[in-house]
C-alpha cells in the first residue's frame, strides 16, 4: 500500500530515488543532481484546474547549484530543460503515489514556453502540475499541464506533459 501523504521531504524524495518509497515495483525519482526538487508541498488526487489531481513542489536556489558553474560560464542560468524534466518527474511521482508500478518514461509534451529564467540570485523555484488525464489500466499514463515559477513569477509553461510507467523498458 502506498503512503499517500500530501507532502514529502527531501529525504522522502531521495528514498524514492533508491526505490524505497513506493516499494519494489513503484517508479523511482532520479537521484543526486538530477532530482530537481527539494520538497513536495501539496499533492491531491481530486484537485487542480481539471479536478484530476494537483502537485506542487519546490527547489531552493543558491549560487552553488551544479548547473550554474557550467551553464554558462560568465552567464549562469538554470537550463530550461531541467525545469521541464522536473515537471515530468512530478507526473511520474504522482502516478506512483496513485499506486502505479513500473519505470517512468517521459512520452512527450504538447507545447513549452519560456518567458523568464532562473538566475543564481533567485530564492525558490515552484513547480505546479495540473492533471488532465490519468490512465491506470494495463497502460499507466498521466497527462498534465505544468508551470514553473521563480520567486512567485511564472517563467515556463508546458501543456500535455506525458509520462508512462513501464514494467519492461527494453521494448520501449
UniProtKB/Swiss-Prot annotation:
Its EC number is 4.2.1.59, 5.3.3.14. One of its GO terms (molecular function) is trans-2-decenoyl-acyl-carrier-protein isomerase activity. InterPro entries: FabA, FabA_FabZ, HotDog_dom_sf. One of its GO terms (biological process) is unsaturated fatty acid biosynthetic process. Pathway: Lipid metabolism; fatty acid biosynthesis. Keywords: Cytoplasm, Fatty acid biosynthesis, Fatty acid metabolism, Isomerase, Lipid biosynthesis, Lipid metabolism, Lyase. Pfam families: FabA. The active site is at residue 71. One of its GO terms (cellular component) is cytoplasm. It catalyses: a (3R)-hydroxyacyl-[ACP] = a (2E)-enoyl-[ACP] + H2O; (3R)-hydroxydecanoyl-[ACP] = (2E)-decenoyl-[ACP] + H2O; (2E)-decenoyl-[ACP] = (3Z)-decenoyl-[ACP]. It is found in: Cytoplasm. Belongs to the thioester dehydratase family. FabA subfamily. Homodimer. Necessary for the introduction of cis unsaturation into fatty acids. Catalyzes the dehydration of (3R)-3-hydroxydecanoyl-ACP to E-(2)-decenoyl-ACP and then its isomerization to Z-(3)-decenoyl-ACP. Can catalyze the dehydratase reaction for beta-hydroxyacyl-ACPs with saturated chain lengths up to 16:0, being most active on intermediate chain length. PANTHER family: 3-HYDROXYACYL-[ACYL-CARRIER-PROTEIN] DEHYDRATASE, 3-HYDROXYDECANOYL-[ACYL-CARRIER-PROTEIN] DEHYDRATASE. This is 3-hydroxydecanoyl-[acyl-carrier-protein] dehydratase. It comes from Yersinia pestis. The gene is fabA.
